[in-house]
């Protein structure tokens, strides 16, 4: 399929007569699939059928094709067939994989389409990072759509980024076939209060999809946000919040990532009536969980087996509902004229995948591994060192505490929101346990001093954890029990070009290097997964009880998610978007 047809996935005009001939039964099919059980995600019916394929498209569905001549016939051996799965919102950078490695990891799991927002790499490298994702999408079998990163930085004036992404530069990418519209508009206060710069972006992309980001937004504020043209939200964390958003016509993108897990809370809202307005996403999911649990296939399985959602409804969310929401009219159904993106399953409830097809080709025959390095080289990933910071000293990361009361960030397990605590310190110890030192360190050569803070809920008993992944500006975040190990972990990342580090008693216990913008690895998914396993072993030995502390850490810097966050410029009270001091003023 030509790149220009990517959004519409339409059949090229010069091929249409041949496809019509195949559909009528006159022409020889390119592929005939027999002995297959159709799961109809519209009616909920399951019935035996044949699927006739010409080129990249389905030309017919029905038993009447079983005797038609075909260049190749494939017996599905009674397998069930569904449309390919669609991830409605994700940041590939959170997988730590290149787009090509992400494709290799998730396409065999049934994810034939992914709608991504590369605002992580865009915060670091600006348009150069964004354009790399566009170049990558052109080389992939998987349908990778790249939404236009709308908030770089997430909250201007509150954090330091490596680059910006001004409207004029955004417009230059608007007509690229991989761009569906505007990515999550995180600056919801700017929308609601008619910020000129924010409204200019909305106006420029009003003719395309516009994704939302509105945690806990309700009432008149939600009305104003929707009035501006925002279409969906993947940040819904309560049942009643989700119900109100559905009632007001907002697309409810139900998220189950590595940290933010909203499936259990929002699943009761999913039924036959609401399902056209509900879809699924992973948002931020690491390679360890992708390998051990799955991707969108995992979300479908959880909906069916843990939350009692009807089988056809669960699959509808992952296919037709998502395609319809984003205007991808040739995707999301097993029907004539649709792109032949198909998932064949031995068991629908277990989501036991037998084979996956993309554009009429079996994924098992694509040899994705063989072309990976060639694609990576062709796409020209940005490999310059983005850790533009001199090594730190212990003095710079020493939090000098006097007796008093301090503002403390409390981690909420499996959520990216935090709680705002005030905790007393008597000069020797805190009134509450598990309070640790933290710092956010600007890494883009601006020379800003580290911002210091306190955090509760990590469980760390010794040592330090440091990361160059700290949403969304991706400065260096470190949490530790002592300045020496904190400095060691941070300086190791500065030297290595970014990644994750665990330090204890003067030694680096584990290190995962992320040389592409301090966010992505050049290694395979298997190698990254093994590195994550080593990190887990290291931080577990130091007492950390969180499932994904590095992902949890990364969101402690994001000042558009409630309630208290630490950017490289200081503590941010997200309730009223203001800086506050570490020590509570008397």
UniProtKB/Swiss-Prot annotation:
Which keywords label this protein? Hydrolase, Manganese
Among SUPFAM superfamilies, the record links this protein to:
Composite domain of metallo-dependent hydrolases, Metallo-dependent hydrolases
UniProt enzyme class: hydrolase
GO molecular-function annotation terms? adenine deaminase activity
For activity, the cofactor(s) needed are: Mn(2+)
Establish whether keyword Cell membrane is in the entry.
no
InterPro entries xref list:
Adenine_deam, Adenine_deam_C, Amidohydro-rel, Metal-dep_hydrolase_composite, Metal_Hydrolase
**Reactions mediated catalytically:** adenine + H2O + H(+) = hypoxanthine + NH4(+)
* Keyword flag 4Fe-4S: no
Per the UniProt record, which EC number(s) apply here?
3.5.4.2
Question: In its UniProt record, which GO terms are filed under biological process?
Answer: adenine catabolic process
The organism's superkingdom is given as Bacteria
Which protein family is named in the record? Belongs to the metallo-dependent hydrolases superfamily. Adenine deaminase family.
Q: What is this protein called?
A: Adenine deaminase
Q: What is the lineage of its organism?
A: Bacteria, Pseudomonadati, Bdellovibrionota, Bdellovibrionia, Bdellovibrionales
Gene that codes for this?
ade
């Amino acid at each position: 399929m030509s790149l220009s047809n990517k959004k519409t996935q339409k059949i090229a005009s010069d091929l249409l007569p041949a496809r019509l001939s195949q559909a009528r039964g006159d022409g020889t099919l390119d592929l005939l699939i027999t002995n297959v059980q159709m799961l109809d995600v519209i009616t909920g019916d399951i019935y035996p059928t044949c699927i006739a394929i010409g080129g990249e498209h389905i030309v017919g569905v029905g038993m009447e094709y079983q005797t038609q001549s075909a260049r190749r016939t494939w017996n599905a051996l009674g397998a069930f067939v569904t449309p390919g799965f669609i991830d409605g919102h994700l940041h590939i950078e959170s997988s730590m994989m290149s787009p090509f490695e992400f494709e290799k990891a998730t396409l065999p799991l049934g994810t034939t389409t992914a709608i991504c927002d590369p605002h992580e790499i865009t915060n670091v490298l600006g348009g150069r990072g964004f354009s790399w994702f566009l170049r990558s999408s052109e080389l992939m079998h998987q349908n990778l759509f790249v939404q236009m990163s709308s908030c770089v930085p997430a909250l201007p004036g509150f954090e330091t980024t490596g680059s910006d992404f001004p409207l004029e530069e955004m417009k230059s990418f608007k007509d690229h076939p991989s761009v569906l519209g505007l990515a999550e508009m995180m600056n919801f206060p700017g929308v609601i209060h008619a910020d000129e710069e924010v409204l200019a972006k909305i106006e420029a992309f009003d003719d395309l999809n516009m994704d939302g980001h509105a945690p806990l937004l309700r009432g008149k504020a939600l009305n104003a946000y929707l009035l501006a043209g925002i279409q969906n939200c993947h940040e819904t964390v309560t049942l009643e919040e989700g119900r109100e958003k559905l009632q007001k016509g907002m697309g409810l993108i139900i998220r189950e990532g590595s940290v933010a897990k909203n499936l259990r809370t929002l699943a009761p809202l999913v039924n036959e009536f609401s399902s056209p307005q509900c879809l699924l996403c992973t948002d931020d999911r690491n390679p360890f969980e992708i390998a051990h649990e799955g991707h969108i296939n995992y979300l479908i399985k959880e909906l069916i087996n843990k939350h009692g959602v009807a089988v056809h409804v669960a699959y509808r969310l992952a296919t037709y509902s998502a395609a319809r929401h984003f205007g991808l009219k040739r995707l999301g159904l097993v029907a004539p004229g649709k792109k032949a993106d198909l998932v064949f399953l031995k068991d629908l409830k277990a989501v036991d995948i037998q084979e996956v097809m993309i554009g009429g080709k079996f994924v098992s025959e694509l040899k994705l591994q063989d072309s990976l390095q060639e694609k990576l080289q062709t796409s020209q990933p940005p490999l310059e060192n983005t850790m533009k910071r001199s090594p730190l000293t212990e003095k710079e990361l020493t939090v000098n505490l006097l007796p008093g009361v301090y503002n403390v960030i409390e981690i909420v397990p499996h959520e990216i929101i935090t709680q705002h605590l005030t905790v007393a310190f008597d000069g020797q110890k805190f009134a509450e346990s598990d309070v640790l030192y933290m710092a956010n360190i600007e890494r883009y050569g601006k020379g800003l001093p580290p911002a210091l803070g306190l955090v509760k809920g990590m469980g760390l008993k010794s040592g330090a954890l440091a990361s160059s992944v700290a949403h969304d500006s991706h400065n260096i975040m470190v949490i530790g029990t002592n300045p020496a190990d904190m400095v060691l972990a941070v300086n190791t990342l500065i030297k290595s070009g970014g990644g994750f580090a665990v330090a204890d008693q003067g030694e680096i216990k584990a290190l995962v290097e992320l040389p592409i913008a301090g966010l992505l690895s050049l290694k395979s998914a298997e190698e990254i997964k093994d590195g994550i396993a080593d990190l887990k072993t290291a931080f577990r030995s130091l007492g950390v009880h969180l499932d994904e502390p590095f992902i949890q850490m990364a969101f402690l810097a994001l000042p558009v998610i409630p309630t208290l966050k630490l950017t490289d410029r200081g503590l941010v009270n997200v309730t009223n978007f203001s800086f506050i001091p570490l020590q509570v003023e008397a």
